[in-house]
Amino acid sequence: MSTTVRPDEVSSILRKQLAGFESEAEVYDVGTVLQVGDGIARVYGLSKAAAGELLEFPNKVMGMALNLEEDNVGAVLFGDSTEVKEGDTVKRTGILASVPVGEAMLGRVVNPLGVPIDGKGIIDTDIRLPLERRAPGVIYRKSVHEPLQTGLKAIDSMIPIGRGQRELIIGDRQTGKTAVALDTIINQKGKGVYCIYVAIGLKGSTVAQVVNTLEKHGAMEYTTVITATASDPAPLQFIAPFAGAALGEYFRDTGRHALVVYDDLSKQAVAYRQLSLLLRRPPGREAYPGDVFFLHSRLLERAAKITDDIEVAKKMNDLPDALRPMVQGGGSLTALPVIETQAGDVSAYIPTNVISITDGQIFLESNLFNSGQRPAINVGISVSRVGGAAQIKAMKKVAGTLRLDLAQFRELEAFSKFGSDLDKTTKAQLDRGARLVEILKQGQYVPMPVERQVAIIFLGTQGLLDLVAVQHVKKFEEEFLAMLDLKHSDILKSIAETGALEADVAGRLKEAAQKFVTTFNDKVKA
């Protein structure tokens, strides 16, 4: 029996078969590793790669394209460069380097790519923001007008910081720079400020100690720690501050307040210098690349106080699509960059750069630190250029002459060493100055509420401590505040609620202080 094959049947069967066939092929833009070493890879191909784009190397090593040259791409590796070898295939990912953001990041310790390293499981968040983003333009900003209290008397009285400000903490190693930053973070408890601590090039043990301190004071509830330790590759140390800024921008653009501490930017500059030299970029002063100023300025300009107008805020330049539906006005991002100086040399390249970018600096001096003045702030060259507008009225009133009084005291102190015959006025000035220095001393991790600071500084500047012996000033301060809490809590409450020191409140405070000085001196003599 012969079967005839009809051509139309064959073609219809083939058509059906072809219609059901789906192409599984994926198209990748790939390149080849020409050379690898010191955390840098030269890749041939990838002609469509973008600057800052993530690249996928074998063995799950990620990299980022930094140098886009005529015949190759210079990429930095975020993983172990021994895992990558010559001839390996590199894939473009098509996405720019980004970091996960959101409330789920609070209380966690992560690396600069947002990968948790605290052993508390994965971070549940869908929103990712790019590491690099243009700073908000002038029309989207508002001038700094709200205070960000550090809890440190010397800073809140003479070098006030406002929300949205950039205040540099600068000093030699071991002068208490990190302690000032941590005190500020601890003092934000209950104030609705989210904190980000970025550790760059620190020892792993130091970071563990910082996390431990924050946990002990209940500060990790509203804090994220982003860390690239000294043993991490230089590219991770280079991008760590940008990851901190991206997370801070999430809170800023959703109408909340954030504080980011970069500890410290000297190490980031060193990591960037290392990458730039390995990528054969031309060196400049101190062998740093020519754009090291731009590295820090584009980072610190992202700290801002955003306008209250939501409609204007929604039109913000470079606003990522993921954030657009959540935008609220009135948020702020405050930056506290830290810079380490060598032997107090603030005129070196990186310190002068960052001083010129920021809105003021807190200068910590090793001589003051060693003489027992802690925090070791040199009031003479420390300044806050915009914080004055954010200071509460009460503090402005009581601390108005404090800086001048201290400056005069330092000058007289230097002269008094040469002569013993001092007139009455000079002696009185020296005595008061010594007491002012004493009341500005403060222990580590014991930030003080602003109303208590106002009460103590009021006593110092009004001369109410002149009858208390210098060595007893700290004890007097403790006991006086305890007495205020017990018998005159309404005075502190009034300052806290109104932010001002009314004449009647000041009168009652003065009266209470005068009575207490007599009682205290009698007790000391006894």
From Swiss-Prot:
Enzyme Commission no: 7.1.2.2
UniProt cross-references to InterPro entries, sorted A to Z: ATP_synth_asu-like_sf (IPR023366), ATP_synth_asu_C (IPR000793), ATP_synth_asu_C_sf (IPR038376), ATP_synth_F1_a_nt-bd_dom (IPR033732), ATP_synth_F1_asu (IPR005294), ATPase_a/bsu_AS (IPR020003), ATPase_F1/V1/A1_a/bsu_N (IPR004100), ATPase_F1/V1/A1_a/bsu_N_sf (IPR036121)
Catalyses which reaction(s): ATP + H2O + 4 H(+)(in) = ADP + phosphate + 5 H(+)(out)
Highest rank taxon of the organism: Bacteria
GO terms under cellular component: plasma membrane; proton-transporting ATP synthase complex
Family: Belongs to the ATPase alpha/beta chains family.
Alphabetized PANTHER family for the sequence: ATP SYNTHASE SUBUNIT ALPHA, MITOCHONDRIAL (PTHR48082:SF2)
Protein name: ATP synthase subunit alpha 2
Lineage summary: Bacteria, Pseudomonadati, Chlorobiota, Chlorobiia, Chlorobiales
